[in-house]
């Protein structure tokens, strides 16, 4: 897709991840790899019983030098946050929009003996600078989620999509 756009003369790129609820980590890594030079950390994940995993760029991407902007909103989650976090932390492009959803968990599927499966959270992922995107939760402090949402609502950060002020 990128090669086709470049063949048609595209010189700058905007990746719109608004309302993108995510996907698979490997696909996010493949996408980011298109925009980063070699040997840049894309994402890492670790958990209590999950060996640390690091994904590095290979420098073979087709848009390593072109200007880049990434659009996100409060519904951009998971793989969208991996992509935007890697672009931001590697100073590769500009991130425009609202604070993202905050889903930074790695899930693994386990097949059961009857053929069904269960997906369990096994780790958290972190952006190259070490930020964990996952919203914090401490047992017994669920009201913090509500306080966060109310604070965002009061400051026009949760419901008003036109909260950015600009001159006419």
Question: At which residue positions do the language-model features occur?
Answer:
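Conserved functional hotspot residues or short segments at active or partner-binding sites
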Residues: 128-168
